[in-house]
Amino acid sequence: MRILCTNDDGVHAPGLKIVEEIARALSDDVWVVAPELDQSGVSHSLSLNDPLRLREIGPRHFAVRGTPTDCVIMGARHILGDKGPDLVLSGVNKGRNVAEDVVYSGTIAGALEGTILGIPSFALSQEYSHDSRSAPLWETALAHGPKILRKALDAGVPKNTVINVNFPACAPEEVAGVLVTRQGKRNQGFLRVDERRDGRGNPYFWIGFERVVVVDTPAEGTDLAALAARYISVTPLKLDRTDEGFSEALRSTLA
């Protein structure tokens, strides 16, 4: 099995080494094509107005001056040649990708691009506590990732479906289990605009995350609830985003 690994944190991110180790537990034919720079939050951005710069940094390891989507396309359509990948793994992201994160995540977008290309694809993310100075417990993803991937692949990943896997912020032995979940919804906004001033007094802005303690209990069956209870969350996400329920009401209204 030929595996293509990518991420959005950049080619030198520690999580990329973890996803490569997970891939090597499944196959010895592993390729890494990842962004040269951090591309967190770029979603499914595609570079159409700028050329892509490709740099080989080691055997089967490539850096692309582009987005995760660019990397998967370059890997599947150019670098790997006539024999493209049988599996795309995107991650392991530093931080969870759940609820509304799914819309912004370059990690998930990398896996989505693999799915668009007809390749079974997984997005992998490791939750960690922003309130502590400790690094993510990468060993949790490393310990549980290969088994989850094997079982999901044995079950057969449907076309047009990407699997979003999130590992809880705990040691491998503290994981409560694995839950198949649905995408959750936060009860409050989690982005803020931070205004600052440069040396000339002119304003500039950062968009950032609100690091607040969420006291609301996540809805049962969601990715948020699973991680809160120290379960690994496995969420199948479809490319088709049509709201079938509202479509019928809309047809009646517009008829």
Curated annotation (Swiss-Prot):
A GO cellular component entry from the record: cytoplasm
Chain positions recorded as a divalent metal cation binding sites: 8-9, 40, 93
Compartment(s) of residence: Cytoplasm
Cofactor requirements of the protein: a divalent metal cation
Catalytic activity: a ribonucleoside 5'-phosphate + H2O = a ribonucleoside + phosphate
MF annotations from Gene Ontology: 3'-nucleotidase activity; 5'-nucleotidase activity; exopolyphosphatase activity; metal ion binding; nucleotide binding
Keyword Metal-binding: yes
One Pfam family recorded for the sequence: SurE
Keyword Nucleotide-binding: yes
Entry-linked InterPro entries: SurE, SurE-like_Pase/nucleotidase, SurE-like_sf
Residue pairs linked by disulfide bridges in the UniProt entry: none
EC number(s) reported in the record: 3.1.3.5
Keywords: Cytoplasm, Hydrolase, Metal-binding, Nucleotide-binding
Cofactor binding notes: Binds 1 divalent metal cation per subunit.
NCBIfam families listed in its UniProt record: PRK00346.1-4, surE
Described function: Nucleotidase that shows phosphatase activity on nucleoside 5'-monophosphates.
Family indicated by similarity: Belongs to the SurE nucleotidase family.
Name used for this protein in its record: 5'-nucleotidase SurE
Chain's gene name: surE
